[in-house]
Regions:
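Cytosolic juxtamembrane amphipathic/interface segments immediately preceding
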Residues: 1-9
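Membrane-interface capping segments at transmembrane-helix boundaries
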Residues: 213-224
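Small-polar-interrupted transmembrane alpha-helices in polytopic inner-membrane proteins
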Residues: 19-27, 112-116, 131-154
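N-terminal signal-anchor transmembrane alpha helix
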Residues: 10-40
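Extracytosolic (periplasmic/ER-lumenal) interhelical loops and adjacent juxtamembrane/interface segments
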Residues: 35-102, 159-188
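Membrane-interface loop-to-helix entry segments
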Residues: 99-111, 194-202
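Membrane-interface helix-boundary motifs at transmembrane edges
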Residues: 6-7, 122-130
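Hydrophobic cores of alpha-helical transmembrane segments in multi-pass inner/ER membrane proteins
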Residues: 111-116, 198-214
């Protein structure tokens, strides 16, 4: 037992990243299980991750179907609801495919944090210092702003009533409506889709290159 504990302590980053990759990768198994007809197992994973993600289908990726993402109008044709709580229980259909148990923002943030951790390990753990805390907070800020404005818009207008983060009229005005198909909605290719993807990536980079070097330094002090 002592030998095992010593091994874990010596290779703590490898163990931590392995566990993180399993935990963050498990939501990709839910659409696989649903497609195989193992609906109880797939539904269990969706339920397991509900506390960590809203799982709104119009803001999620679908696998094994016609498209990667669907608009709320497309979803409402087979699942007529505008209630956010009810919408999270739409997992997909054989034709549409099955959604990943992460929303697009959480998919980007949660999944890429251990991936950036692997990059940190590959670049040489001992040589890299933690990001300055101001830069770390700056990396989190875009995702926080994006998420907070979506929450505010959804609370005021609902998820289907043309809120300011659904239409993004403000962005169309700022850019002279140069890209008409880019502004409204949450589906692939829209501003919201890219904003969630890239702010999640930036936050994941910040967390990985702040937390993992800091934990490494802490471990070295303990070993000294």
């Amino acid at each position: 037992m002592d030998r095992f504990a010593a091994t874990v302590e010596r290779h703590w980053l490898a163990w931590l990243l392995a566990m993180m990759l399993i935990v963050t990768g498990l939501p990709f198994l839910s659409p696989v299980l649903m497609a195989l007809g193992w609906t109880n197992a797939g539904t269990f994973i969706y339920t397991l991750y509900t506390p960590f993600c809203h799982q709104l289908p119009q803001r999620s990726w679908f696998l094994f179907g016609e498209k990667l993402t669907y608009t709320l109008d497309e979803i409402n044709r087979v699942y007529p609801s505008s209630d956010p709580w009810q919408l999270r229980f739409f997992y997909g259909t054989q034709a549409m495919g099955w959604k990943v148990a992460w929303s697009d923002r959480m998919l980007s943030f949660y999944t890429m944090t251990p991936v950036f951790g692997l990059l940190y390990a590959a670049l040489g753990r001992g040589r890299l210092r933690p990001l300055p805390w101001r830069l770390f907070l700056l990396a989190l800020l875009p995702m926080a702003l994006d998420g907070a404005t979506h929450i505010l818009s959804d609370l005021i207008f609902g998820v289907s009533n043309g809120g300011f983060r659904d239409t993004n009229v403000w962005l169309a005005l700022l850019t002279g409506n140069a890209f008409p198909a880019f502004y409204a909605g949450d589906h692939f290719g829209t501003f919201n889709w890219y904003a969630r993807l890239f702010t999640g990536l930036l936050a994941a980079w910040g967390v990985a290159f702040f937390a993992f070097p800091w934990l490494d330094q802490l471990q070295r002090r303990r070993d000294a």
